[in-house]
Amino acid sequence: MYSPTRSYSLDINSTNEPHKLHIHEWGKQKNEKVILCLHGLTRCSLDFGPFGTFFSKDYRVVCPDLVGRGSSSWLVNKSLYQIPFYLRDICFLIDRLKSEDITLVGTSLGGILAMFLCSKKTIFSDSFFFSRNDIVDLEKIKNKNNFSKLILNDIGATVNFKELLRLNYATSFDKEFYSSEKEAEKSVKKNFREFGPHSDFEWKFLTQSYIRYDSETRRFVPHFDPGILNPYGLPAIFNGLSSIGIQALPA
């Protein structure tokens, strides 16, 4: 029902580790009006299937799988699963879209990436996420981009400490495996309940985009590389915040 119009991969060799970035698209490829959708931490581009289908008449909807998710490559060096690496990939993709009219839609982690992309240059130097080399490279790339709109979901200008703890707990279940799709759906309903009320069909859809079948174990497992969770341990984030003089997170 929500199958993409096109699916393809980009070979990216300009980063610390060559890899493939997989993209799903809805709508006409020649449409210069683009909506670029960025998914959450443990989700993938197929989450935007209903969204892409709805807007495909008027827009070219482009949805990448962040590296380590969906059909994109898994990195050998797990420490590279970081915001600067994701931003480089997205900028690489944007450069190939050749569009001057891009609307950014970001959910959760995707929203954080979208805010960095739309922000003024100084945000890179003000953030502990970026090294000096990251700042130089990203500011060069970012200067080429012109976004017309920014739409955020499940993220905002302030961070709630309780929500960070909940996220840390929720991602701990993501290393599980499931003997059937039904068992996986039950787990997804429980651990993604903050998504709000959904029909049985919608929960099934969200589950199918979340799991893959592992032929070796003959079980269903989350679609992503478990290594994506390691860089986001809360202690590391708190240490980073304290290193730049932030003593508390606003609620």
List where the protein language model places each region.
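Aromatic pocket-lining residues of Rossmann-like dinucleotide-binding sites
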Residues: 55, 117-121
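Flexible "cap/lid" loop of the alpha/beta hydrolase fold
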Residues: 130, 135-181
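Conserved serine/cysteine hydrolase catalytic core
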Residues: 214-251
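N-terminal cap/lid segment of alpha/beta-hydrolase-fold proteins
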Residues: 1-20
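Helix-loop "lid/cap" segments that line or gate small-molecule binding pockets
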Residues: 168-174, 186-197, 209-212
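Conserved HGGG/HGGXW glycine-rich cap/lid loop of the alpha/beta-hydrolase fold
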Residues: 22-76
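Active-site loop/oxyanion-hole signature of alpha/beta-hydrolase fold enzymes
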Residues: 16-17, 63-105, 134-138, 143
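Gly/Ala-rich beta-loop-alpha elbow adjacent to hydrolase catalytic centers
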Residues: 106, 110, 114
